[in-house]
Amino acid sequence: MPIITLPDGSQRQFAHSVSVMDVAADIGPGLAKACIAGRVNGELVDACELIEADASLAIITAKDEEGLDILRHSCAHLLGHAIKQLWPQTKMAIGPVIDNGFYYDVDLDRTLTDDDLAALEERMLALAAKDYDVIKKKVSWQEARDVFEARGETYKVEILDQNIARDDQPGLYHHEEYVDMCRGPHVPNMRHCHHFKLQKMSGAYWRGDSNNKMLQRIYGTAWADKKQLKGYLQRLEEASKRDHRKIGKQLDLYHMQEEAPGMVFWHNDGWTIFRELETFIRGKLKEYDYQEVKGPFMMDRVLWERSGHWEKYAQAMFTTQSENREYAIKPMNCPGHVQIFNQGLKSYRDLPLRMAEFGSCHRNEPSGSLHGLMRVRGFTQDDAHIFCTEEQIMEEVSACIRMVYDVYGTFGFENIVVKLSTRPEQRIGSDEAWDRAEAALAEALVLNGLKYDLQPGEGAFYGPKIEFTLHDCLDRAWQCGTVQLDFALPGRLGATYVGEDNERHVPVMIHRAILGSLERFIGILTEEYAGLFPTWLAPTQAVVMNITDNQADYAVKVAKALNDAGLRAKADLRNEKIGFKIREHTLKRVPFMLVCGDKEVEAGKIAVRTRKGADLGTYPVEELVALLTQEVQTRGQKKVEE
């Protein structure tokens, strides 16, 4: 007679074992219809799972995050069902859930086309409309292998042989005649899987190994209802318009080419944005009392072995040889900063020591993962390393948090999700040290009035960390900032200081990044602003345009006055209609278009228009220079139109 305890504390008693779906039906028909799965004693299970003893139970529906993931996973199985009907010789590989959707890797003797994708989606819709039950069967390992061997599913057989223990009982999910294997859970009925869209195809090596066969990967998205699906597709359309790769080309910011994959060729206007970001962060470094240093581009393999990076990151490091020595081009700045710290005897009075660098780093990312500025091989980190005592951790972390929010606020990012990752099972250091470190991070977050999500066990083996994830105007998440404690690296590389007791101690190291990579952050900003960079970041801040040749000298004079004040201005003296000029510079996202005709010349003024089409009237040149300068210097806190 199991007693089921529900999330609100209420209890229901049953005379015999019951399934999750039985409990949902006992509560009400509406909940039974919405039930996708259950969480029994904290574990996600299928709706058909029997509960035979007292247990806590939460009914999972599509309104829950887990429910949406289950729905998407079942849509991957639906894709498998459809593709096997259309092309029966297809061999199915894996079909996991990803952010906002799912994919399935398939081995097919034809290259799928866009027309094939449309036909596949149509078949999926027809199958889902049948609202058939999904039947789960737990079978022995051998029975599962026999099923897939008989069906010619060589990839499923390989998964069983290499990844599933012989004494395990795999779950087989039956979609009418189609059978797939999964841990689950999955939806009990396909009525939950009506709102999806197949999106694109790509190539993917089996098990991510380039030595294996290239499979075809089919991507899709799935949502709980029509409104959610429509909203997501609209956001995707808007994201496509904001794609930094398109805008970067339109605005002539940068380019990339095959001869240097994952490396950025910055053009003048893109490099202007890059340098402005550097200048901004450099000012913050001074404000928060950091030293700025510069480490070498590459260092001997021996140093990377001592730091531990060679063991963990060797495959991602570019290397070269000279005079029988092997060097690694740095993938990160921290070992170099420890070398700088080690020069000269350090006392506790020297701590905290805050060391920052705009470090040029390189990582050998897989070519298939490269994506514009968002995923590159050569990048510039804005990270810093703080050497401090254990007692100084909380205060230093708190200052890092203030700096992070100070910087993000300047760019208009207000929706920031904070996560605190605590000790993993495999770690170095005593439990007492971890207790103090985790408490210090949590206290720093509370001190700054921040709510945070706890991620137990997700910290690095060498220390807990805080992650800052930005949500942009399309509600996409970008993990940029980190504050990571490190108990390991200073000791591995021989960093010490003399304490008040005249004994040598190993300092705690705090890794701190705000933008992460400048390249990636420029990509994020390009999409966030849709290329409409704030005036202080805009490559060209103002264009002065004459109406006829009579005002050419005056236009040059106004542009010179702006440039002499430290602004970035150009004069457009082309023999084109003023409307044509305005449109062209609007498309180039220039913040201010300054127009001069005979009246403006005579009055010593200039007519001001914005890239958004607002007519701000006429200003004396000196006044406009002062107002634009103020907007740039305050980074938009005081704007011309105000």
Swiss-Prot record:
GO terms for molecular function: ATP binding; metal ion binding; threonine-tRNA ligase activity; tRNA binding. It comes from the Bacteria. Binds 1 zinc ion per subunit. Residues 1-61 form the TGS domain. CDD domains: TGS_ThrRS, ThrRS_anticodon, ThrRS_core. Its cofactor is Zn(2+). Residues 243-534 are annotated as: Catalytic. Its EC number is 6.1.1.3. Disulfide bonds: none annotated. One of its GO terms (cellular component) is cytosol. Zn(2+) binds at C334, H385, H511. It catalyses: tRNA(Thr) + L-threonine + ATP = L-threonyl-tRNA(Thr) + AMP + diphosphate + H(+). InterPro entries: aa-tRNA-synt_IIb, aa-tRNA-synth_II, aa-tRNA-synth_II/BPL/LPL, Anticodon-bd, Anticodon-bd_dom_sf, Beta-grasp_dom_sf, TGS, TGS-like. It is found in: Cytoplasm. GO terms for biological process: threonyl-tRNA aminoacylation. Belongs to the class-II aminoacyl-tRNA synthetase family. Catalyzes the attachment of threonine to tRNA(Thr) in a two-step reaction: L-threonine is first activated by ATP to form Thr-AMP and then transferred to the acceptor end of tRNA(Thr). Also edits incorrectly charged L-seryl-tRNA(Thr). Homodimer. This is Threonine--tRNA ligase. It comes from Aeromonas salmonicida (strain A449).
